[in-house]
Amino acid sequence: MERVEGTTPNEAAAAVADGEEPPQGPPALDDDVRTGAAGGNNLAEDEAGAGRPRRRWFRRAALALLIALLPLLTAETALYVNYQGDPAQGTHTRNRDALWLGHAWVDGRKKDADVTALARRLQGTGIRDLYVHSGPLEHDGTLPESVYPRARWFIDAVHEKLPGIRVQAFLGDVLAGEGADGMVLEKPDTRAAVVRSARQILDTGYEGIHLDLEPMPSGDRDYLTLLDALRRETRSRDAQLSVAAHQIDPLPALHTVFGLFTDHPKWWSQEFFGQVARRVDQIAVMSYDTAQPLEGTYGGYVAQQTSLALEVTPPSTDLLMGLPFYWESNFDHWGHAETVPAAVRGVRLGLSRTDADRSRFGVALYIDFAATEADWRAYKEDWVR
């Protein structure tokens, strides 16, 4: 006799003799057992059931990530497309370019032979202005004369070996913010001290003031007030006033959104950029440290920045676009992407599309002590020609 689960052979025979039907199989599973609950014995279904929520979670997470990245991917694609096309003929140097120089030129480290080498390097280029670091300013706006002891020597040496090239004093400081010490432009005494410092260093023989105060918030009225005062001073002495400018919002009001998360401004509104440009003789856009991951997107970004700046810079002001004459590799500046060839091509594309015949236009090279032979070659071959 076939063994029936839960019944011995003798019990089964006795049940038949009494006229009873023996059990024909295991009892039906109740709902708890079917679902594996309360001591159920369905391990395979248990595991399958546990896997389904995990798969759903991963799908939802992937979808959420895609939705979050979609605006960024769209923007990067637009920048890459902006890098396509051919620059117009003639979009090359207008002989109004500039070069940022380090502090070694005015503190005694550089010698006559260095000036001779610099003159040889700049021969046949479009560079007309040198922004030589002569500060920094103190947080109260003052400038110790001890920080530029060899300025007069350098100015005279440049005039001798590079006639026609102007030497401007590159002055800057960090602005107070995010709990850090720095210059407070809201203080009238500080602004007055900056003007006195400009007057003091112009007495040394510099032909202009190049101001770089960072990080400068978009719309800062105290900054505009300072520029007005400096412009009166430089004009009275037939000197130049130039500034290093933040990049312009690549998307409308992006500086406002960015400001919700940090007190360290990166962009200016296009309107504020124009307000600054109308107060100076030269405005140099720091069009590097963009965090762009590819040459194509970086070049497209520079093309966009060039167009945005051209739209609001008056024809009487020199507009210069910064070129990255240095190598770094970090989140803000990917060295493989932010190259001189990509920047020059971007500048030419933006110029071609917006104001190809603009005469008061150039590029500014940052910075002499970090530049490579490849940087100089790209500048000369792609921009100077």
Language model segments and positions:
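Hydrophobic membrane-insertion alpha-helices, especially the h-region
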Residues: 60-78
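Substrate-binding cleft of secreted/luminal carbohydrate-active enzymes
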Residues: 78, 288, 311-385
